[in-house]
Amino acid sequence: KVTLEGFSRGGLYALNWAAKNTDKIACIYIDAPVCDVFSWPGRKNAALWNDLLKEWNLTDEDMNSFKGNPIDNLEPLAKAGIPIISVCGDSDKTVPFKDNMDVVRSRYLALGGPVEVIIKPGVDHHPHSLENPEPVVDFILRHQPEYEKYLHYNVRGSLQNSFVKFEKERKGRVAFLGGSITEMNGWKNRIEKQLQQRFPYTTFEFVEAGIGSTGTTPGSFRLQNDVLSKGKIDLLFVEAAVNDHTNYFTPLEQVRGMEGEVRHALLSNPEMDIIMLHFIYDPFILMVAKKQQPDVVLNHERVANHYLIPSVNLVQEIGERMQDGEFTWEQFGGTHPLPFGHTFYAAAINHLFDSMWKGITPDSPVVAHEIPEEPLDEYSYYKGDFIDLKEAKLNKGWKYVPSWRADNKYEKRRGFADVPMLEATRPGDKLTLDFTGKAIGIFCTPGPTAGILEYSIDGAPFKKL
């Protein structure tokens, strides 16, 4: 299958040929494309209009019933699910965007076809393309059959609600909950840009709630404070396979934590779409080579199955690509990927979008997700929240610091500095807290300022933490 590229009037040729040869097309890239000959060249441009008539062997009268405009021949492409990406200047005076690609986008979406548009503000017909063509290259690469054979994602439930809200209401709030792979500049930032390409008229708010080293147990307790308190979330990404594994959480805790995040999120807003991600790190590589799945992935997948949450298994995909010699672990970038590695994470998520948004139109209904009456584990942390630090009774030595920062020369992690903190510096310092609940934890700072806590609940013998 081929990728068709059409610039300017080349867009006319590319779209028309593709509509008659859908079985031969992988994807289409069109740049400032002519999609309606009545817009360009148009009858006002007599010389070019006559060239058009000559080329098509038509008369001016014949044009009153002309059927060769791409804007009128999109249905075969949409039925075949041919992905289209377009780059256009919004100030194009030669081939006006509003009369051409904007019409294609609107009609293609209405037919359920996948389309992305990169709009260049203030740009006329020239210059074509992008100074950095990476978004187009990524789009083309991820739609090649050879690329797709490595993909491992599970389609469950629906992502219809987020699509309809983004396209119809033209407002969207997207949240990213996870550890340092989510916190860093990488897949998250690419998805933010690519969502804007898919929905160029939508105003997005992105809630970036990645904190290094945190898995689902702290995630389920900080969900309310770090994500849900920001407003109604339309699309939520959750990931924690690496940190739930490297921090030695038990299988039981892995389920309770992930279910805590997912169930709490859905109970807060049943219309919220959720996507679960599984990232790779060193210990998982050998498991893939042995055709094994990490237990933490299987445990998180139990939650995904119970709540019909789609998931993307990057452990399997990246492991297989490395086995086949496509790249090395060093080239990928390791646990915290290089930009090269993050392109694979983002591409897999985009494939899930393509699959689950296929056939959905802006007029599709928004439907609440069904939430199972019973949780997988009655002790899951789906009512998790932060307790106000001021509720603690500070006895000997403890103090409340409104904006705490470690007094040392070392690098400070976001989320562990310039935040409210209870601080004690001497052995024997004490505090007490009254609470009612099935579980409680203490969110501690890491690093050289960390200490050892001894705790007792309901008069039980003290234990070290």
Located regions from the model:
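Mobile cap/lid helix-loop segments that gate and shape the active-site cleft of serine hydrolases
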Residues: 33-34, 38-76
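C-terminal catalytic histidine-bearing segment of alpha/beta-hydrolase fold enzymes
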Residues: 98-147
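Primarily recognizes the serine-hydrolase "nucleophile elbow" in alpha/beta-hydrolase
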Residues: 2-47
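Short, proline-enriched alpha-helix->beta-strand connector loops that line the catalytic pocket
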Residues: 77-84, 113
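Catalytic nucleophile-elbow at a beta strand-turn-alpha helix junction centered on a G-D-S/GDSL motif
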Residues: 171-186, 211-215, 439, 448
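Short beta-strand/loop motif that positions the catalytic acidic residue
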Residues: 86-88, 92
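Alpha-helical cap/lid subdomain in secreted, periplasmic
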Residues: 189-205, 209, 214, 218-365, ...
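Conserved catalytic region of serine esterases and O-acyltransferases that act on ester linkages
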Residues: 145-158, 169-170, 343-465
